Amino acid sequence: MAFAWCVRRSASKLASACGQARSISAVVNRPSLALNPSPLSPFVSRGFLYTMAVDKLSSEQTLHLVIDSELNSALQTDDPNLNEEMAPGSFPLKIRDKPGDQSVTLTAYYNDERIHVDVGMPYLGDDVIDVFGPNNDELSFPLVVTVIKKNGVSIEFTCQAYADYIDLTDLTVHDYQYQMGETDWPRFKNLDDNLKKAFHRYLATRLDANITKLLHKYMVSKIKREYLLWLKNVNKFVDG
């Protein structure tokens, strides 16, 4: 069962919960239940409380089974070679990734430039791609690459990162030395095509195709890790 299933089912779960609430309300307000009231409640019979207890036990057992299935599915699809590929010395950028955070920060140096990369989690809408399936290469991640010169001037690239390329969508120039602040005009889409190509090449020199591919694999793996963390927290709740 896939992660996407959980995302898509939120609306139906809400409708189901509302239906259960109406059913319980109908049972509680039946006149026959008032003939033999429970000492615990003037409105609910002992039989009703027993049925509710059995239903609760059954639902918890079912939830445990589903969570175990999801955990096994996520663990079986993890990439065993990823840690080696992303290890210092193999991957040129230093990664800062805290469990539970929805973004990853990477830093590196290129000649006299300091490169700072922020990668966010993708938006998982109704048509989300199954991250446990074979088509997760189609996922894209929001990416902001900041290149900082020694003189303090920097340029910030706003992008979408795919498995095999980076789509540059906008850029901003910062020059605090002369109190220019931010300059985000003209918009990237309005630039001359040759200038656009030059910026794409400039960015690709600092984040080449191999880095892009590994970064995409790492972020897909992070989605799975965060999902596993969420499942384990749900398990703790059920066990409590």
Curated annotation (Swiss-Prot):
Coiled coil region boundaries: none
GO annotation, cellular component aspect: mitochondrial matrix
Database matches in Gene3D superfamilies: Mitochondrial glycoprotein
Keywords: Mitochondrion, Transit peptide
Localization, UniProt: Mitochondrion matrix
InterPro entries associated with the record: MAM33, MAM33_sf
SUPFAM superfamilies tied to this protein: Mitochondrial glycoprotein MAM33-like
Keyword Transit peptide among UniProt keywords: yes
Family membership noted in the UniProt record: Belongs to the MAM33 family.
The protein's name in its UniProt record: Uncharacterized protein At2g39790, mitochondrial
Species the sequence originates in: Arabidopsis thaliana
